[in-house]
UniProtKB/Swiss-Prot annotation:
Biological role: Essential for recycling GMP and indirectly, cGMP.
The keyword ATP-binding belongs to this UniProt entry's keyword annotation: yes
Binding positions (ATP): G13, P14, S15, G16, A17, G18, K19, G20
Keyword list, A-Z: ATP-binding, Cytoplasm, Kinase, Nucleotide-binding, Transferase
Gene3D superfamilies reported in the protein's UniProt record: Guanylate Kinase phosphate binding domain (3.30.63.10), P-loop containing nucleotide triphosphate hydrolases (3.40.50.300)
Protein name according to UniProt: Guanylate kinase
The organism of origin for this protein: Desulfitobacterium hafniense (strain Y51)
Domain of life where this protein originates: Bacteria
Length: 200
């Protein structure tokens, strides 16, 4: 019997759609799912810890990671670099663990080229007005940066057709239930079951 590898789950969507909140709640409810910590050159937000939420790196350190092909994907977003360290993700999937990546859309498209068997989920807010309110509520960015994020979000919505699923994050419990249903359905797909049934 073949080894049953884990799922690679890619969660992305516009800034402020609530990807981080949904990811944290999904991990709380499904401890068998592992979170892939991304590397970034952006400054930590209040409460974020290096190695737990992100690997916070200088631009020079990040450039070295790119040159040494240590990243599964990387992208520049709003003036900062983001990327996914490759080794830990591949090791976890081969060991049978499900791994979730919470990454930007540019990065998700790179991952899709390398891992088309992944599960690609696009998280959207219920409206652009709601998205604007969420980003303003953070209180961590200037108005100029917020407007840039909103303009980027409008462009990013054009990529929804590149994903397998779309989840509207209106109410967190409902959105998390949708994510759990997607993962359950993917686990049951025939193409992911290496078994041959005999005598049925």
């Amino acid at each position: 019997m073949e080894q049953n590898h884990g799922l690679l789950i890619v969660l992305s969507g516009p800034s402020g759609a609530g990807k981080g909140t949904l990811c944290q709640e999904l991990l709380r409810q499904l401890p068998q799912v592992k979170y892939s910590v991304s590397a970034t050159t952006r400054q930590p937000r209040p409460g974020e810890m290096d190695g737990l939420h992100y690997y916070f790196r200088s631009r020079e350190e990040f450039q070295t990671m790119i040159e040494q092909d240590q990243l599964l994907e990387w992208a520049e977003f709003c003036g900062n670099y983001y990327g996914t360290p490759q080794f830990a993700v591949e090791q976890a999937i081969q060991a049978g663990n499900d791994v979730i990546l919470e990454i930007e859309i540019q990065g998700a498209l790179q991952v899709k080229q390398r891992f088309p068997q992944g599960v690609f989920i696009f998280v959207v807010p219920p409206s652009m007005d709601e998205l604007s309110q969420r980003i303003h509520k953070r209180g961590t960015e200037s108005e100029e940066v917020i407007q840039k994020r909103l303009q980027t979000a409008a462009r990013e919505l054009e990529y929804v057709s590149e994903y397998d699923y779309v989840v509207v994050n209106d109410e967190i419990p409902l959105a998390v239930d949708k994510l759990k249903s997607i993962l359950l359905a993917e686990k049951c797909r025939v193409k992911r079951k290496p078994y041959v049934f005999q005598g049925v």
